[in-house]
Amino acid sequence: MLILVSPAKTLDFDNPPGSENYSMPTLLDQSEQLIEVCRKLTPTDVATLMKVSDKIAGLNVARFSSWQKEFTPTNAKQAVFAFRGDVYTGLDADTLSPQSLDRAQQQLRILSGLYGLLKPLDLMQPYRLEMGTRLANERGTNLYQFWGDIITDELNQTTAEQGSEFIINLASNEYFKAVKPKKLNAGLITPVFKDCKNGQYKVISFFAKKARGMMVRYILDNNVDSLEALTKFDTAGYYYSEKDSTVNEPVFLREEQ
């Protein structure tokens, strides 16, 4: 099975990575085209487009300016160790065993507004370009139009090469909209995580994001290779609810914390 997750806004390029191994993104030619578009933006443009402070806008204008296509361990970092945020807190990549990290490199893919699709050990340079950004480009008015079928084609190629029957979608709606589900050759499974609050089970964003990362960790550490094995996920008190689930949306519940 192939696993999809979102990236994170928070980045860590200060601490050393958890592995010396690295790979290269496959869609850097596309990334370079986006960088050329972004380099035409002023700090004011970026602040408005991304709805960020002047300070963050200035930082990202500088990032666009210094971005270069030749990635090395000196000017870039492996994606799974660079991203920080709720999903990555749940995954805790720094403590993955070498075996689990190898499985991650095969099975895990990170959607990205700038890089399209990243393997965990793909080097990346720091950036901020969320998939929902309405960045006008030669292919349209936003990044969904820019990426078109490219990400979906990459996923189909990967699942074909690996013989993967299912894609486990643990990405946010914003990022998964860059994928064309009807054009996927593998089956699509989208787990749902609900926490009990005031007697009702509901999706609580912070908990759900962390749970997505914990499920990735569970799959990697336990070498999960079937949907039945996936329903055994029980990290941090979550449990599979058969009565609330459908074939394509397994639901995991947790009692009030």
UniProtKB/Swiss-Prot annotation:
UniProt GO BP: response to hydroperoxide
Annotated InterPro entries: YaaA
UniProt signal peptide: none
Lineage: superkingdom: Bacteria
GO CC term (a single one): cytosol
Pfam families named among the record's database cross-references: H2O2_YaaD (PF03883)
NCBIfam families assigned: PRK02101.1-1, PRK02101.1-3
UniProt cross-references to HAMAP family, sorted A to Z: UPF0246 (MF_00652)
Family: Belongs to the UPF0246 family.
This protein's name: UPF0246 protein Spea_1078
Organism: Shewanella pealeana (strain ATCC 700345 / ANG-SQ1)
